Regions:
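Conserved glycine-rich cofactor-binding loop
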Residues: 17-18
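Conserved glycine-rich Rossmann-like NAD(P)H-binding loop of the short-chain dehydrogenase/reductase
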Residues: 31-48
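Conserved NAD(P)H cofactor-binding loop of Rossmann-fold oxidoreductase domains
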Residues: 93-98
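Substrate-binding pocket helix/loop in short-chain dehydrogenase/reductase
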Residues: 101-102, 109-114
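Active-site helix of classical SDR
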Residues: 125, 161
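Residue(s) in the substrate-gating loop at a strand-loop-helix junction
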Residues: 145
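SDR active-site lid
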Residues: 175-240, 250, 254, 258
C-alpha cells in the first residue's frame, strides 16, 4: 500500500464511476489525493473508492448525485461542506451525450444534457472558484470536447454545450490569472475516446468509429491532470486531435459543417 503523501489535498471528480472519470480517480489516488467520487451509480463508486483506499491509503468519500436535477450542484457543494472537506482540485467531468436529429430527440433529453454539461458545471465552478480563491488557490479542470470546436449536425446540442464549456473555461482562466487568485482553470478537449459513452444506447444513435481513431481514457486523463497542474489553460490531448483542432481554422464554418454532417450521418448506427 502506498501511503498518502499529499496531506490536506482533496480532489472532487464528477462522473467518476466510468471512463475518463474513473481514470482521473486512479491518477489522483496515485498522487496521494483524498477523493470525493460523484456519479449516479452508487455500486460502481463504492467499488472504486474501496480499491483506491486499499491500494493508496487515501480517504475516499462517495456522493451519489444526479447533476441534471434542480439545485444538484448546490446540494453537492453543501454535502461536501458538511463533511468538513476542503477541495483543492475540482474536475467537472460529468457529461451527457445525445445523438440524432434535433427534432426527433426528446426536448427533455436535450434539456437534461444542457443541465449537466452547462448548468451544473458552471455552478460548481462558481462555487469552488470562489472558495479556492479565498483559501489560497486550487485547480479546476473542466472537460469540454473537440466537438466544441465546431458545429456538428446530428450532435448539435452536445457540441454547443461543449463550445460553451470551452469558451467559458478559457475566458474564466484569464480572469482568475489576471486577478492573481491562485486558481488555475483549465479546459480539456478530448476527441474520440474509448469509453462506454461511445456505445451507450441511452445516447440515441451510436457512432461507428474505428478503434484506431480513439485514445484511451487513461491517456486523456493523464494529459488533463498533468496539463492542469502545469498551469495550462487549454489541453487538446493527442497529435490527431491537435491536428483536427488546427484545421478548423482553415475551413469556412459552412463548409466544415457540411463535411461533418455528411460524416456523422454515415457513421451513426
Amino acid at each position: 500500500m502506498v501511503m498518502n503523501t499529499h496531506k490536506n489535498k482533496t480532489a472532487l471528480v464528477t462522473g467518476a464511476s466510468d471512463g475518463i472519470g474513473a481514470e482521473f480517480i486512479k491518477i489522483l489516488a496515485g498522487r496521494g489525493y483524498d477523493l470525493i467520487l460523484v456519479a449516479r451509480s452508487e455500486d460502481k463508486l463504492n467499488d472504486l473508492a474501496e480499491k483506491m483506499s486499499n491500494e493508496f491509503g487515501i480517504r475516499c468519500f462517495v456522493i451519489v448525485a444526479d447533476l441534471s436535477s434542480a439545485n444538484a450542484a448546490y446540494d453537492l457543494f453543501h454535502a461536501v461542506e458538511e463533511k468538513g472537506l476542503d477541495v483543492n482540485f475540482l474536475i467537472n467531468n460529468a457529461g451527457l451525450l445525445r445523438n440524432g436529429f434535433f427534432t426527433e430527440l426528446s426536448l427533455a433529453d436535450q434539456e437534461q444534457m444542457i443541465a449537466v454539461n452547462v448548468l451544473a458545471l458552471t455552478s460548481l465552478t462558481h462555487l469552488y472558484a470562489n472558495k479556492m480563491a479565498a483559501s489560497g488557490g486550487g485547480h479546476i479542470l473542466n472537460v469540454a470536447s473537440l466537438a466544441g470546436w465546431m458545429a456538428i449536425p446530428n450532435q448539435n446540442v452536445y457540441a454547443a454545450t461543449k463550445a460553451y464549456v470551452l469558451a467559458f473555461t478559457q475566458s474564466l482562466s484569464n480572469e482568475m490569472m489576471a486577478a492573481n487568485s491562485g486558481v488555475q482553470i483549465t479546459a480539456l478537449c478530448p476527441g474520440y475516446t474509448a469509453t462506454k459513452m461511445m456505445d451507450n444506447p441511452e445516447q440515441g444513435a451510436t457512432l461507428r468509429i474505428p478503434a484506431s481513431m480513439m485514445m484511451s481514457a487513461q491517456e486523456v486523463a493523464e494529459m488533463g491532470i498533468k496539463g492542469c497542474l502545469a498551469g495550462k489553460d487549454l489541453i487538446v490531448p493527442g497529435i490527431a486531435n491537435k491536428f483536427t483542432a488546427s484545421i478548423t481554422h482553415f475551413f469556412s464554418k459552412s463548409l466544415l459543417t457540411k463535411l461533418l454532417g455528411s460524416f456523422y450521418r454515415k457513421t451513426m448506427g
